[in-house]
């Protein structure tokens, strides 16, 4: 019995060796190598390898669009190009999802297609409108926007000016809210083109609103409604535009009517907020209980003043007139609607971006003349006067 088992094992081992010897290998075309799988006793073909995918180049885009590589380069860099070619290239870029290597572009051209934008408060409606205008113009010229929010911190404003230059931005747009000597010097010392909005600096490109005329026309309208005991809630006079110019505009209108403009009762906000409007209105009511008109430096401040007047039993639009500046969306829905000044802030942003792009085009050549642009406004009369 034991000898039979031994014979069976020997026969199995022999058959196994014979099986391995008789494995048939089919001939393969070319130089394709077989892989022997010793566990399955078979030869297999190697797995197919996916071809390496290389990123698309300008040349690839040019071939797909049927244009020259130079035309694609001009498209990507915002250069001159016919509308027909621009449309064809844009369609190919969008279809392929092509994105140029910005680092390679910088090495090749020596230009960084990034612009720093410094803002005082990202939560402000007017700031948002200006940013929208800037972004539309920069995007059309293939520039990226780097946003820096100072939260009304003067030191942070100066630090961002330095940091953006260290990051090699092509230029800077500053949404100004003060005009301190330190800021003025820092702007003039910038190594890249700078454009300022909202403030006026000598020898720098600026885009600003006519704050003085706007405040004057707003106060004139209030005077037309028979208001004579007018008070003013203003902003910090470190700000030459909203602080000084708007207060001067109110005084101009009073002076034209023969009133004592220098004696204008006023209180100053530390921030353009409803809370500060509330505080200043309480202060002025205590000092001038006979007041019949209130002009506010911004609409948001006016909303805070409105709360106090209602609590005091003053009927806005009847017992007392109220007006703000800025055309905040909420002014349309409060009751009564708030009379205000509408500035065209998106256009401010667009014009600032155009100025900067023009400066970048002239970099390295004869400098373009410094442009300073004042934009208009509209007086929006509602029921609050």
Language-model features, listed with the residues they occupy:
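Short hydrophobic/charged patches on amphipathic alpha-helices used for structural packing
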Residues: 104, 158-161, 184, 219, ...
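Short beta->alpha connector loops
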Residues: 151-154, 175-180, 201, 300
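Short histidine/acidic/glycine/proline-rich micro-motifs that form metal-
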Residues: 77-79, 121-124, 236-241
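Bacterial carbohydrate/catabolite-sensing allosteric modules
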Residues: 2-56, 95, 136-141, 189-196, ...
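Short gly/ser/thr-rich secondary-structure transition/capping motifs
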Residues: 95-101, 155, 175-177, 306
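Amphipathic helical "hinge" segments at domain boundaries
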Residues: 43, 47-53, 87, 98-170, ...
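Short acidic/polar active-site loop segments enriched in Thr and Asp
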Residues: 68, 113, 170, 228-229, ...
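N-terminal helix-turn-helix DNA-binding module of bacterial transcription factors
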Residues: 17-20, 24-113
